Amino acid sequence: MFSAQNKIHKDKGVAPTEFEERVAQAFFDLENTNQELKSDLKDLYINQAVSMDIAGNRKAVVIYVPFRLRKAFRKIHSRLVRELEKKFSGNDVIFVATRRIMRPPKKGSAVQRPRNRTLTSVHEAMLEDVAYPAEIVGKRTRYRVDGTKIMKVYLEPKERNNTEYKLETMVGVYRKLTGKDVVFEYPVADP
């Protein structure tokens, strides 16, 4: 019969961790108990789940979903996040699509690498995933006097009430995933 094991597909030969099994079980329970999510969750599964400690005594649950299923997850994102945050006692839940980064081709090699496999492209796509459901409406890179870079990301003001409470978590998760500093802001509307 169906079980929580069907909700997590890892690479060959890798067993899921205890935390990943808890997340898969939460997905399975939601599919069986929540009628409005049942049909949407039927064919969905995850690749990996990680619990991250964020500064300020907060925790985040980062769930990696297959790249091909990210659109299906985005359709039910707000309802799914709300239910999973209840199950994980207030931890912020963030969905990120699994993407691969390829090395640059060697000199003299005729091999081309796709744009979506470059480090820059993968990091930009991760930024969009972390900021979802808010859309990114602008970016500024600020270079400090000491040479460090910080990226300011402006989010869609319409989604402010859905994302404002987890801005710190989004900053911490993006820093842990990519090693880059980022600040999320909402653009000030001109009166």
From Swiss-Prot:
Modified residues (N-acetylmethionine): 1
Pfam family membership, one: Ribosomal_S7e
GO CC terms of this entry: 90S preribosome; cytosolic small ribosomal subunit; small-subunit processome
Protein family membership: Belongs to the eukaryotic ribosomal protein eS7 family.
Taxonomic path: Eukaryota, Viridiplantae, Streptophyta, Embryophyta, Tracheophyta
Biological process terms in GO annotation: ribosomal small subunit biogenesis; rRNA processing; translation
GO molecular function: mRNA binding; structural constituent of ribosome
PANTHER family: 40S RIBOSOMAL PROTEIN S7 (PTHR11278), SMALL RIBOSOMAL SUBUNIT PROTEIN ES7 (PTHR11278:SF0)
Keyword terms of this UniProt record: Acetylation, Ribonucleoprotein, Ribosomal protein
Highest rank taxon of the organism: Eukaryota
UniProt KW Acetylation keyword: yes
The protein, known as: Small ribosomal subunit protein eS7
Annotated PROSITE patterns: RIBOSOMAL_S7E
